[in-house]
Amino acid sequence: MGEFKIQSKFKPTGDQPKAIDTLVQSIENGNRGQTLLGVTGSGKTFTMANIIERTQKPTLILAHNKTLAAQLCAEFKEFFPDNIVEYFVSYYDYYQPEAYVPQTDTFIEKDASINDEIDKLRHSATSALLERRDVIIVASVSCIYGLGNPEEYKKLTISLRPGMIKDRDEVIKKLIEIQYERNDIDFARGTFRVRGDNLDIIPSSSSSKGIRIEFFGDEIDRIREFDVLTGNIIGERQHVSITPASHFAASEETLEKSIRVIEDELEDRLKVLTAEDKILEAQRLKQRTNYDIEMIREMGYCQGIENYSRILDGRMPGTPPQTLLDYFPEDFLMFIDESHVTLPQVRAMYAGDRSRKTSLVEFGFRLPCAFDNRPLKFSEFESKINQVVFVSATPGEYELDHSKVVAEQIIRPTGLLDPVIEIRPIQGQIDDLYGEIQRTVQRGFRVLITTLTKRMAEDLTKYLKDLNVKATYMHSDIDTLERMKIIRELRLGEVDVLIGINLLREGLDIPEVALVAILDADKEGFLRSETSLIQTIGRAARNSESKVIMYADNITKSMDKSIKETERRRVIQMEYNEEHNITPTTVIKGVRDIIEATKVSEEKENYEDEVKKAAKKDIPVEKLIEQYEEEMKEAAKNLQFERAAELRDIIKDLKENSK
């Protein structure tokens, strides 16, 4: 069994050693909750990695969106190359939930596009938890949705070893039972094929490696792993576990028992609807449910089988669903990253789901058991936590109230200070801001501006463009990929000014930014709360020459608190730097808190340097292309898809230029 072991040239510095010791001690003392209060750029991820190494517990890291989850996953893969680091997020590229609108008598069928790659990663995550303890799973909030019973998942897993007395047809029957399909032509993930005495399987947790079971009569003679694309043998296996192709797979016995319970619930519900004189609803429910029962009986599943998950799991009505958290051992450790944003998301999930299901049940589209196919309530989520570390630069009241220990991480390894904050009047703010933009851009830096409305962001962008400023805006209407493209352009210098609303808070760490301007800073509310202001100020904490300008006519309580907190941190940082002779420096290369897509400015420099070096050393272009292709495959394997895309473009350029 592997142990967590960090591979890094860095050692904990600044506040990191103290924070690590404090939190590890608290966890070892059995405390349930603790908080890591770490400022932007202080190396919170590295601190988390050190805590994992010291405590040696299976770990779940909860992030508030897919982009940050992917970024964290890539970072932890670098820190723990010899351990298992998995990515678990919603597998829907597109999702339209089942719904009914009574006012217009409109039923909307469930419509979804499932991302096969992410589904594979989800299976890889649950498989890893069954097999090992040195597992880190980085997940989005979707991990609190029902996933199927882990006990049933374990029970249905097929365990095979060379020398076992197993009939080939018996193994095939078991594969079909756990929802694998036979396909001798289109051999893909979750399928198997039969060639003589050989049974080839592509497990649900992989798409590039297959398992070949070689039989000799009724005995397993040999188990080999092979490359699905080339067919080449990779190696021999002494044991293999084939996990179900669906997290909702169930044994024949469980399905038969479940069908009887569904039929009983249907009978009870039809009596209720008939008594209420809802004849149409009763007929609709009977027809839809009987169709589902027939599908389950014949195929082992039906469309929307998750709506019967409570019955399949054998749970009582109203009890919480089984989720990813139930796949972890009891002593697992959880980190909630950016907890001030993530926890409110967890709280909101249940209410939205419940309101949609109510009309489906009332109007005969679903049985009441559909209510129990839901995300966890916040109280249920809390009950499943063993030990947790809340991670945030601005933890909320909940985190502080539920923490025995709060470890501050204020010193940055780079020596960078929290920025200077200036307050200027709102009168003439745009003209003043234009002058500041010009001075900042002339020094080769970038500007972030935060407004209160989308309209203002768009109008200000147009105004600045008319003055020949390279400006663009970013708000919630802009999707993730477009957002990453904008950040890339900002880092490259194709854009000098980025204007946004609350999107300029968490996860936008750009070292080139030397000015953050907060317009209408004295308009008290969600976008100008103490937490929002501190997070926005943090965007200027990556550059040694940065500053923040708040345009306001009054100093609100939130402004006062955020300014005082920033000044408090700044004093601590200055004293530490003075004591240890540290000069604050802007570090662009090697800063790991940057979203992978934004590293393009570094990559462009690196690429140009590589080409120059190759030319000097007379390295053939073909050799350079080969090196980049290997790096591209490795980046894709490590979920660094934007990096892989950049390398693909570089390879394309090299091929065109070498013609």
UniProtKB/Swiss-Prot annotation:
Domain Helicase ATP-binding: 25-182
Molecular-function annotations in GO: ATP binding; ATP hydrolysis activity; DNA binding; excinuclease ABC activity; helicase activity
GO BP terms in the entry: nucleotide-excision repair; SOS response
Entry keywords, A to Z: ATP-binding, Cytoplasm, DNA damage, DNA excision, DNA repair, Excision nuclease, Helicase, Hydrolase, Nucleotide-binding, SOS response
Domain UVR: 622-657
Alphabetized InterPro entries for the sequence: Helicase/UvrB_N (IPR006935), Helicase_ATP-bd (IPR014001), Helicase_C-like (IPR001650), P-loop_NTPase (IPR027417), UVR_dom (IPR001943), UVR_dom_sf (IPR036876), UvrB (IPR004807), UvrB_inter (IPR041471)
Compartments in which it is found: Cytoplasm
HAMAP family in alphabetical order: UvrB
Homology family: Belongs to the UvrB family.
Comment, domains: The beta-hairpin motif is involved in DNA binding.
Quaternary structure, from the entry: Forms a heterotetramer with UvrA during the search for lesions. Interacts with UvrC in an incision complex.
UniProt-recorded name of the protein: UvrABC system protein B
Origin species: Clostridium perfringens (strain ATCC 13124 / DSM 756 / JCM 1290 / NCIMB 6125 / NCTC 8237 / Type A)
